Amino acid sequence: MTDEKNAETTDETLLLVSGSRGDKGRDKDYVKKLSNAILQVFYKHDAVTLRCVGAASLNNAIKAFIIAKGEAQKKGDSLLIEPSFTTVKFGDEEKTGIVLEVISID
């Protein structure tokens, strides 16, 4: 990632979101699994970053965040996402991605 803001992201707090899974993909439970991963990482590290490249992965990330936010609210926690752009290298090719920082507003 090239954003200064995301320089603190570690491998333990970064979730790479797939666009080839989800509603029409191979794994229909992917969004629910991703929402569970968001909560697990957030409660363990107090931070989680979702990295998306492409519309399908962003769609999965938003759906998973909405589910995770609802589950967190049941525990009295309020989560919010802060989006930003990033550049991701795939071999010799660079693509623009979107990073969603999950933060607590408590």
Placement of each model-derived feature along the sequence:
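Short, hydrophobic/π-rich interface segment
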Residues: A55-I81
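Long, polar low-complexity intrinsically disordered regions
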Residues: M1-T9
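Short, ordered loop/turn segments at secondary-structure junctions
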Residues: S20-G22, V53-A55, S84-T87
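Conserved mixed alpha/beta catalytic, RNA-binding, or beta-rich assembly cores of soluble enzyme
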Residues: D11-A47, A61, F65, K69
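C-terminal edge-of-domain segments
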Residues: Q73-D106
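Compositionally biased, intrinsically disordered low-complexity regions
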Residues: R21-K24, A56, S78, V99
